[in-house]
Structure formats: C-alpha cells, structure tokens
C-alpha cells in the first residue's frame, strides 16, 4: 500500500520481485503504488487480492479510514511505500502498528 504520488515505482516492483512465489498482495487498487505492486505481482505470478474503495469511501474520510482498517485487518505484514506527506498512508501505517502487525515502510519523495 502507499501513496499515489510515490516517485519511485521501480522500488515497488523490486520489492514485489523479491517476494517468494507463495506470497500474496492485498491492494486498494489505486494509482501509484497499488498499480505498480499489482503489475509486478501479476508478472511474477503472485496472487493479488483487490479491495478497491467505493465511491462513498473516496468521498468520505471516515469511510476511507474504515476501508484502510479492512486492509490492515486482512494483511499479515503491512508494506508501505510513503511519499513522506500522504496522511492516508501514514494513518494506515499507524493503524497497522496499533494492531500489532509487522510493518515495513519505504520512504521516497513525492512525484512532481
């Protein structure tokens, strides 16, 4: 998961390519990190579970937070690619940490 404006999609692909074949990816199906992870996972034959946000969730911050909690609940390990400013990515990382999940965060610059 991660920021839509993460400037280094190749880092996402490199991470996915390092995963074992039995791994799976859960994604919110957004542009940016989600799209890069999905593309790399499908190219490698890694299972992808898509949990897209509904229109209501995109329009309502409270509903968006609930959807991000569902992503946290569904994962064993949260891997985030953060642009350093996205509040949604930061909040989801905090939710995962509060839930006792293993969390890995890769920080990059926002895309210009």
Where are these regions (language model features)?
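Acidic/glycine-enriched connector segments
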Residues: 2-111
